[in-house]
Every structure is written in structure tokens, then in C-alpha cells.
Amino acid sequence: MCTGLRFTDDQGNLYFGRNLDVGQDYGEGVIITPGNYPLPYKFLDNTTTKKAVIGMGIVVDGYPSYFDCYNEDGLGIAGLNFPHFAKFSDGPIDGKINLASYEIMLWVTQNFTHVSEVKEALKNVNLVNEAINTSFAVAPLHWIISDSDEAIIVEVSKQYGMKVFDDKVGVLTNSPDFNWHLTNLGNYTGLNPHDATAQSWNGQKVAPWGVGTGSLGLPGDSIPADRFVKAAYLNVNYPTAKGEKANVAKFFNILKSVAMIKGSVVNDQGKDEYTVYTACYSSGSKTYYCNFEDDFELKTYKLDDHTMNSTSLVTY
């Protein structure tokens, strides 16, 4: 399970990232893919990268398999678990841009600068149920894609095929589908950041005991529906911040509030599900911030002239 988040600051700079909530770590680390790095495809012609990319992931046979990544132009994408709903094509379709589902991360960040361009191109994309190699299964994912102007959600399901949704609340979690989550927000329209006031109930004065009464009923558990509601509510109501430091703090404050704490969720395999890492990319400074469940120190990595022009992957 996972939570994705995006917002902009008072200058229009994007802050975008995610929690990765799983039952184990995968040996993931920060990866910078420079320009002119080999980029193989399953169904398209092999090529080389045109834009530098930074994000978290693992390297598989020289291929940077990202969990979330961001290009030098400020366009980013994160893949989140979408179990029971994700259904990719059984094979390539003539006349379509055929991508193995894992390839969408680098295809998006290599070919586009703006979400509007991605939305148009996706009309001709077919995502194929093809793993990176025989050691890996196909992950049932959906994706949040964002620049500083807007965000979209991309889902492929058996019932609806590929659907692209505008994401005005700047949040994504897991199943059910995104449209269900938007509908569910209607159950929480009574939430308000302002405290309730004293009332008279048939002559009996009834007054709140303390602060926070306006948000009474805000979910706090770890199911995807409730993480979506809480993250969306906090994202909408958190004041717009000024400066990089304040906005990075804002980002981590929101996502840590929906983090899965080790020991609080045990999956059907008997493993703890927990937030392995939290990460945020700042488009203004081209900086990737992250910390881990077992190491809360905030680490920073930058796309700069050295890393963007490296002759090989830069891994940390």
C-alpha cells in the first residue's frame, strides 16, 4: 500500500512524492539516470535517455526500475499498488504505443515536459502485462503523474480499460479505483478545520472540551480509503508555505500523518506492512528528499551538472 501527494508553493514550484508502504524493503535506493543512457523497450525501438531523471527504485540488469521518479523539467510519476483492479493487456496491439507496464515510468519522464502532453499521448498507449524479467512478477499498479500545473491518475482495469482522471486534490492511495475515492469524499463534507461552538440542546448547554472538534470524524486508520480522505483533507487545508524548507516540512508532515507504523498492520502472509520510505521532489531546486523507517534523518540528492551528465547510473 502507498500514498502519493503533490502540491505547489506560493511561487508555483512543485513538491511531489510518496510513501512506500509494503511488507519488506527491496534494497531500494536513490537512482539518477543521466542523459544519453541506454533505454531498452520490450515492444518499441531501443533508444537512449534524453532527460535526466532522479527517484527511488532498484536497478535490474542495468535498467533503473523506479518506484517514483522526476525528470529535469519537473514532470514526475509514482506507481502505487492497485490490487484486484489493475488489468493490463495480454499482448501488443497493432497501431498502438505498446509499453510493458513497468516501462511507463521512464517513457513518461523521457518524452514529456507537461502533464497535458502526457494526457494526449496516453490516448494511443497500450500497457502490456509484461514483467521486466522472469525473476519478477508484473506489479498491479496505477500511477499519479504531475507537473507544477496539474496532476492526473492513470488506471487500467478489466472493467474500464485505460482511464485518465484529473486529480485536483493532489492525492492517490490504492484500491478501489480513483473515481470511487472521489465519490467517497462526499461522506466527509462536514469536516472543517475550525472548532465547533457551544450549543443549547433543549436548554442544556453543550460545549466542546478542547480543540479539533471541527475535524471530528477524520479517519486515522491505514486502509486506502481512509488514508486518501485524511491526506486530501490535510493537503487542502494546510496553509500555502513560503520557501523550500517550509514546504518540505509541510510535505513530510502530511505524509507522516498517514504513514503505516510497523506493528500496526500485519498482512495475510503474517508480515508487517509499514512505510519503508517517504520521499519528496522539489522541482524548484531539483532536489530529492527522503527518509526511511529505520533512519529518520532527512537525506537530500540533487540533479546537477555532474549527475545529469554522468556516463553511468548514479546510485546511492
From Swiss-Prot:
| Keywords annotated in UniProt | Hydrolase, Lipid metabolism
Q: Which GO terms describe its biological process?
A: lipid metabolic process
User: What pathway or pathways are given for this protein in its record?
Assistant: Lipid metabolism; bile acid biosynthesis
What's the EC number here?
A: 3.5.1.-, 3.5.1.74, 3.5.1.24
Applied uses are: BSH is a promising microbiome target for developing novel alternatives to antibiotic growth promoters (AGP) to enhance the productivity and sustainability of food animals.
Q: Which residues bind taurine?
A: N81
Q: Which domain of life is it from?
A: Bacteria
Residues engaged in binding deoxycholate: C2, R18
For this UniProt entry, the molecular function terms from Gene Ontology, in alphabetical order, are: hydrolase activity
Enzyme class, first EC level, given as a word = hydrolase
How does its activity get regulated?
Glycocholate hydrolysis is inhibited by various previously identified BSH inhibitors, including KIO(3), NaHIO(3), NaIO(4), CuCl(2), menadione, riboflavin, gossypetin, and the antibiotics oxytetracycline, demeclocycline hydrochloride and methacycline hydrochloride.
- Temperature-activity note from the record: Optimum temperature is 40 degrees Celsius. Maintains approximately 70% of its maximum activity even at 60 degrees Celsius, whereas its activity rapidly decreases below 37 degrees Celsius.
Task: Spell out the InterPro entries in the cross-references.
Answer: CBAH (IPR047711), CBAH/NAAA_C (IPR029132), Ntn_hydrolases_N (IPR029055), Peptidase_C59 (IPR052193)
- How pH affects activity? Optimum pH is 6. Rapidly inactivated below pH 5 and above pH 7.
Gene3D superfamilies (UniProt xref): Penicillin V Acylase, Chain A (3.60.60.10)
Role according to the record: Bile salt hydrolase that catalyzes the deconjugation of glycine- and taurine-linked bile salts, which occurs naturally in the intestines of animals, releasing amino acid residues and deconjugated bile salts (bile acids). Can hydrolyze the amide bond in the bile salts taurocholate (TCA), taurodeoxycholate (TDCA), taurochenodeoxycholate (TCDCA), taurohyodeoxycholate (THDCA) and tauroursodeoxycholate (TUDCA). Oh et al. did not detect activity with the glycine-conjugated bile salts glycocholate (GCA), glycodeoxycholate (GDCA) and glycochenodeoxycholate (GCDCA).
Q: Which family does it belong to?
A: Belongs to the peptidase C59 family.
Name it.
Conjugated bile acid hydrolase
From the UniProt record, report the name of the gene that encodes this protein: bsh
